[in-house]
Amino acid sequence: MADQNINKNEKVLTGQPTENQEPVHKRRERYKGTHPKTFKEKYKERQPEKYADTIEKVIQKGSTPAGMHISICVNEILEFLQIKPGQKGLDATLGYGGHTREMLKCLESQGHMYALDVDPIEIVKTRERLQNLGFGPEILTIKQLNFANIDEVVEEAGLFDFVLADLGVSSMQIDDPDRGFSFKTDGPLDLRLNPEKGISAAERLKTISQTELQGMLLENSDEPYSEEISKAIVNEIKRGNEIDTTTKLRDLISKVLVTIPENEQKEAIKKTCQRTFQALRIDVNNEYEVLYSFLEKLPNVLAKGGRVAILTFHSGEDRLVKKSFKNLQRAGIYSEVSDDVIRPSAEECNRNPRARSTKMRWAIKA
């Protein structure tokens, strides 16, 4: 009997219902401040349809609302693609669906679009978002597929009149700490675009040699401190300390750069973290191999006179796209390619700082 009373008291103390007691109603935690900082606190920003005023205020400040992605170079893309009603198009990187939505508007309910994405989390949200805007399966086909496999889509769809590939990571992926893309917030060191496939960045670091890691940092992000960072990471893991969170990697990089003059240290750590995370993301997602495959197959999915625009966000991607377009133009496969990159306007960069590193290149099928 005494034991039963103890158990009953324990239940009361822990908030669990006793046998003759109704379950305790727990209110959800509410953010009490006026300036939400964490991803979870920014619940209004993650519901743009419900809190349009909040979204507009965030954008006006030059920030990207949490859980959203502001499409880049929309006007430049549409001006080049010259989409006409009745055409067939492909958005090879669906993401938040902003570019797809604008291209669908150009079709004026005539023709069809296909859109691809590897992210199983965001693709569900984007499909629903576009469906609610009136873009259902009669005008839009969405597939969870890596854009390296565009040849599989053309078997079903036929040749495309226009293709877009935006190679950037979407803001909603970067901003969600659970995805582990950003060094600014604590989260698992994952960096996979599809968390259901492959190994995380944390797992990758457990098995990589110093030489291989240094080479990765150089090739994927031109990291000037590649030797020091790779040595520190490998030594830390050899000591039995896992680097399995974004914060652990950021703190280790900070220690490596401790000898940099104090007035330069903060910016140096920020830039080095950006480059290191980028290099790891490219590696775990095989981004260069995927891009090689896409560029190689691209001419075979374009109709005669078909147009393709590609947005890149770092020099490694841009070099691959430029080289492919120029080589295929010399081979007579493309009739025209962009001589130079197209960049977002200063106004767009002020409105959306994440657009600053964007470069756009285009090609037309002969």
From Swiss-Prot:
GO biological process: one example: rRNA base methylation
Compartment(s) of residence: Cytoplasm
EC numbers for this chain: 2.1.1.199
Primary site of residence: cytoplasm
The entry's keywords: Cytoplasm, Methyltransferase, rRNA processing, S-adenosyl-L-methionine, Transferase
Top enzyme class: transferase
Catalytic activity: cytidine(1402) in 16S rRNA + S-adenosyl-L-methionine = N(4)-methylcytidine(1402) in 16S rRNA + S-adenosyl-L-homocysteine + H(+)
Region (Disordered): 1-46
Signal peptide limits: none
Stretches with biased composition (Basic residues): 25-37
Function (record text): Specifically methylates the N4 position of cytidine in position 1402 (C1402) of 16S rRNA.
PANTHER family linked to this entry: 12S RRNA N4-METHYLCYTIDINE METHYLTRANSFERASE, S-ADENOSYL-METHYLTRANSFERASE MRAW
Official protein name in the record: Ribosomal RNA small subunit methyltransferase H 1
Protein source organism: Lachnoclostridium phytofermentans (strain ATCC 700394 / DSM 18823 / ISDg)
Gene behind the chain: rsmH1
